[in-house]
Amino acid sequence: DRYRTTVAYAEQKNAKEKIKILHTMGVETICCPDEKNQIDLKKLMVNLGNRGIDSILLEGGGTLNDSALRAGIVKEVQAFVAPKLFGGVAGKTPVEGIGVELPSEAVELKYTDICQIGEDIRIKCQVCDKKQEESCLQES
């Protein structure tokens, strides 16, 4: 099967029963906890690479997005903007976490494509490698 579901997890109480259920449904599981018993994203990428998987779609909330960016496993970002404003002091952001104090510490992106899909706008960006400054110079 070209498309298969894989679930990564860190050890948790009562996980064995859930894992059994997933296996009976044909879902593959990968256990790769870090020292805080959270999923070690770098270890997960190595594991998936060893299985011949060279790209993934990471869909999640701001905390997962922050963890993935900090782990250095993100090469491309796709953001969708809908013609709606929500606002609010406690509003969720695409990247949660502790943030950065200075603009120079921010993750830099380079636009690779912008298009309209229905009423939404999709923005694709390459994540810049700060070690290779020229990889993300914006063309004028």
Predicted regions and their residues:
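Enzymes that bind and transform nitrogen-containing heteroaromatic metabolites
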Residues: 1-140
